[in-house]
């Protein structure tokens, strides 16, 4: 058999293998009334101090730098540490030496960690933040059976680009409004928005 014949015979197997490879996900940009409400309460003079539980990015930083000169990225989203590494990461999260953080971007961290970890996270945020700190969080209340880790990037004060960065995983039980308020205390929910996609966005303010 000629060499070209052998190549042709191998192509179906190559095509089959290629079909098993998950295609790269594309980012999806959406409006965010929760972020709009958060930023509307801030001043664009650089005085704020931001703790972002996600990752840094140029476009993301351009939006935040309108409001803050001091920004720390924890890197807990999209892939939070697990087990003892989670506890160590929380303990290692440093305070801002100049002034306590007064803005927290928590993204969908509450969907990504177990209930005991949620309590530890909020306790650490309370220790690191100013008395009137504001917090933004989003949870998936769609009831979907699976969810994917997401990387969120600010594209404006009222828009966010969301990129899936991992395979689907079984979704946790949706965190409903009343349990979420208990989880976040002493951050008190002041505004909540339900999106058509089933997401719920929350803005909360720390109370003494």
Predicted regions located by residue number:
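Conserved beta-strand/loop positions that form the S-adenosyl-L-methionine
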Residues: 53
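A short His-aromatic
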Residues: 112
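Class I (Rossmann-like) S-adenosyl-L-methionine-dependent methyltransferase catalytic domain
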Residues: 1-42, 57-94, 134-208
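A short glycine-rich, Lys/Arg-flanked "PGG" loop and its adjoining helix->strand segment in the class I
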Residues: 119-134
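Hydrophobic adenine-recognition pocket in adenosine-nucleotide-binding enzymes
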Residues: 109
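Hydrophobic beta-strand segment of the Class I
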Residues: 104-105
């Amino acid at each position: 058999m000629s060499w070209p014949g052998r190549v042709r015979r191998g192509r179906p197997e190559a095509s089959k293998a290629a079909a098993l490879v998950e295609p790269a996900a594309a980012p999806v940009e959406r409006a965010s009334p929760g972020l709009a409400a958060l930023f509307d309460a801030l001043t664009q003079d650089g005085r704020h101090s931001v703790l972002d539980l996600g990752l840094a990015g140029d476009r993301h930083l351009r939006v935040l730098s309108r409001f803050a000169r001091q920004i720390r990225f924890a890197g807990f989203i999209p892939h939070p540490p697990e087990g003892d590494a989670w506890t160590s990461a929380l303990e290692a999260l440093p305070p801002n030496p100049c002034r306590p953080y007064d803005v927290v971007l928590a993204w969908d961290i509450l969907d990504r960690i177990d209930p005991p970890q949620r309590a530890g996270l909020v306790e650490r945020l309370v220790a690191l933040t100013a008395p009137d700190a504001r917090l933004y969080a989003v949870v998936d209340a769609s009831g979907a059976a699976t969810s994917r880790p997401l990387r969120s990037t600010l594209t404006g004060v009222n828009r966010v680009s969301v990129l899936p960065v991992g395979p689907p995983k079984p979704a946790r039980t949706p965190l409903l409004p009343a349990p979420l308020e208990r989880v976040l205390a002493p951050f008190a929910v002041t505004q909540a928005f339900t999106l058509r996609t089933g997401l719920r966005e929350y803005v909360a303010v720390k109370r003494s």
